[in-house]
Amino acid sequence: MAEITVELVSVERMLWAGQASIVTAQTTEGEIGVLPDHEPLLGQLVENGVVTIQPIDGEKLIAGVSDGFLSVSKEKVTILADFAVWANEVDTASAEADLNSDDELAKAHAEAGLRAVRRSSEGL
């Protein structure tokens, strides 16, 4: 099976690095799926989107991301996000409360996290 190297990095931490069969991300141009040997491109992530990684070995990984870039070469995908959180790390009750916050950053992070949770529960 063909593989592509993937790195998902936020301002705060490296979330994941490894080999995957496909990566999907929501960009300002639409949702994109990246397979090995994809044509090089640079994309801007949407404000509150979802990144999905299918590792070669293991379960599908789903992260909520907010702002940033997606860099694709034939061998590697690098996702640099201002904020990223795994769906299974999201405290749903706290995130839902943050949706009503006056703090725009907290609201954006909550929206990204909840989108990841929804995507995860849909099994997509």
UniProtKB/Swiss-Prot annotation:
Keyword Signal: no
Name used for this protein in its record: ATP synthase epsilon chain
Keywords in alphabetical order: ATP synthesis, Cell membrane, CF(1), Hydrogen ion transport, Ion transport, Membrane, Transport
Signal peptide coordinates: none
Pfam families to which the protein is assigned, alphabetical: ATP-synt_DE_N (PF02823)
HAMAP family found in the cross-reference section: ATP_synth_epsil_bac
Single Gene Ontology MF annotation: ATP binding
Intracellular or extracellular location(s): Cell membrane
Membrane topology summary: Peripheral membrane protein
Keyword Transport attached: yes
Function: Produces ATP from ADP in the presence of a proton gradient across the membrane.
Record family assignment: Belongs to the ATPase epsilon chain family.
